[in-house]
């Protein structure tokens, strides 16, 4: 046997190995390195860049599960773009086209209500337009895979802008910034009653399946939804505005939970109790506000719940089942809607939030629902107490509203 040549051994040890060619994670063609956060070929990288920069919206003619491989001559663009997102391509990495002309002033052609609401929203940010990543909009490229949640976001902004109009007092300018103030219980009741038609419209704008239901089933769902939604939304508004010592209302006003005496004080009216009795009354209701803070507001803050996760929770609350007078067809439709939203939520958590374990996040979200039920029951019990003893009792229409006895 011939001795091993040490020189040849050294050369073999330090000779660079032949690099394996990468594969495009979208179409399985030969890769061209990392583009926008994922291994991709030049064709898929160019397709993604063009789709994002031009705000393209694609529609799948199948079931959103088309095969995406390089040997298919005409790949489904909708599924191809969805695959780009699923493998980790980030739309934020695409440099948007520059406007070489510069910003141009756009003059309104008319002064209809929708344009008026839009301009109000620009002048005074609505409640969910706080400067927070929790309420940021997604790139339009996500529209195809999250149609319901994206529709809820667009229509929630419309509702938010409309709130700026309906909660204005007579004589107040629509274009002057409204300063939030602490309200008393009569003002809070009146604001909640004004909210009913807006929330009903929002539900109809968001869910096409709701519009097709018989009127009696619409009433069953909405009666069951309004009070839990009000409690859930109030907690979310506190969360995104980073406050836990007040209860923020959709109007932007708030209940000062550290000074409940002012909540039960009605200026220019004779008080039904002495100051000492009011103090005892406040101590009796303080635990209810604390339950809301500890059960909903603080957990939302800890989990950093964002606006799309909030919409998913709203969907689960609205399409409840086993309700009095609810039909089997209504329950089946509700299950179908919730299944679709759950798929959209899973896609959002995986592709937009980049979570490795979306199921754990979903589980954390769902733990808020039992706490919501406890807060709603406590609120209804408090309203019942004030009604029975006729002390700071709310008007009948608000009492019926809270207990689902309206419409």
Swiss-Prot record:
Disruption phenotype: Abolishes R24-induced expression of irg-4, irg-5 and irg-6 immune response genes. Abolishes PCN- and P.aeruginosa-induced expression of irg-4 and cyp-35C1. RNAi-mediated knockdown reduces lifespan of animals fed P.aeruginosa, but not E.coli OP50. Suppresses the induction of hsp-4 and the accumulation of active xbp-1 following exposure to R24. Abolishes PCN-mediated protection from P.aeruginosa killing. RNAi-mediated knockdown abolishes PCN- and P.aeruginosa-induced expression of irg-4 and cyp-35C1. It is found in: Nucleus. Keywords: Activator, DNA-binding, Metal-binding, Nucleus, Receptor, Transcription, Transcription regulation, Zinc, Zinc-finger. Residues 130-405 form the NR LBD domain. Pfam families: Hormone_recep, zf-C4. SUPFAM superfamilies: Glucocorticoid receptor-like (DNA-binding domain), Nuclear receptor ligand-binding domain. Signal peptide: none annotated. One of its GO terms (cellular component) is nucleus. CDD domains: NR_DBD_HNF4A (cd06960), NR_LBD (cd06157). Residues 21-96 bind DNA. Expressed in intestinal epithelial cells, excretory gland cells and in several head neurons. One of its GO terms (biological process) is regulation of transcription by RNA polymerase II. GO terms for molecular function: DNA-binding transcription factor activity; RNA polymerase II cis-regulatory region sequence-specific DNA binding; zinc ion binding. Belongs to the nuclear hormone receptor family. Ligand-binding domain exhibits affinity for phenazine 1-carboxamide (PCN) and xenobiotic immunostimulant R24. This is Nuclear hormone receptor family member nhr-86. The lineage of its organism: Eukaryota, Metazoa, Ecdysozoa, Nematoda, Chromadorea.
């Amino acid at each position: 046997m011939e001795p091993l040549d040490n020189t040849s051994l050294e050369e073999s040890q330090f000779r660079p190995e032949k690099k394996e060619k990468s594969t495009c994670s979208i179409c399985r063609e030969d890769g061209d390195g990392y583009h926008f956060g994922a291994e991709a070929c030049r064709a898929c990288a160019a397709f993604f860049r063009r789709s994002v920069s031009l705000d393209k919206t694609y529609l799948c003619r199948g079931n959103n599960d088309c095969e995406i491989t390089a040997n298919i001559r005409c790949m489904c663009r909708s599924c191809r773009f969805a695959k780009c997102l699923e493998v980790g391509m980030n739309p934020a990495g695409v440099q948007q086209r520059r406007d070489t002309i510069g910003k141009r002033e756009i003059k309104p052609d008319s002064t209809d209500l929708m344009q008026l609401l839009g301009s109000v929203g620009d002048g005074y940010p609505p409640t969910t337009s706080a400067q927070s990543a929790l309420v940021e909009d997604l790139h339009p490229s996500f529209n195809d895979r999250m149609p319901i949640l994206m529709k809820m976001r667009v229509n929630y902004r419309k509702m938010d802008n409309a709130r700026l109009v309906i909660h204005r007092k007579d004589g107040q300018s629509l274009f002057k910034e409204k300063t939030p103030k602490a309200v008393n219980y009569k003002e809070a009741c009146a604001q909640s009653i004004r909210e009913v038609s807006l929330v009903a419209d929002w539900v109809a704008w968001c869910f096409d399946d709701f519009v097709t239901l018989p009127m009696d089933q619409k009433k069953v769902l909405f009666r069951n939804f309004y009070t839990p939604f009000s409690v859930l939304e109030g907690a979310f508004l506190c969360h995104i505005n980073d406050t836990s010592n007040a209860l923020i209302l959709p109007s932007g006003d708030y209940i000062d939970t550290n000074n409940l005496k002012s909540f039960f004080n009605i200026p220019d009216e004779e008080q039904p109790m002495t100051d000492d009795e009011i103090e005892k009354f406040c101590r009796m209701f303080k635990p209810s506000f604390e339950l809301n803070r500890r059960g909903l507001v603080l957990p939302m803050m800890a989990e950093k719940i964002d606006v799309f996760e909030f919409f998913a929770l709203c969907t689960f609350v609205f399409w409840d089942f086993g309700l009095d007078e609810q039909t089997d067809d209504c329950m089946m439709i509700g299950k179908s809607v919730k299944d679709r939203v759950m798929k959209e939520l899973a896609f959002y958590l995986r592709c937009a939030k980049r979570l490795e374990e979306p199921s754990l996040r979903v589980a954390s979200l769902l733990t808020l629902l039992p706490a919501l039920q406890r807060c709603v029951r406590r609120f209804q019990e408090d309203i019942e107490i004030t009604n029975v003893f006729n002390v700071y009792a709310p008007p009948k229409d608000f009492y019926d509203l809270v207990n689902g006895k309206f419409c």
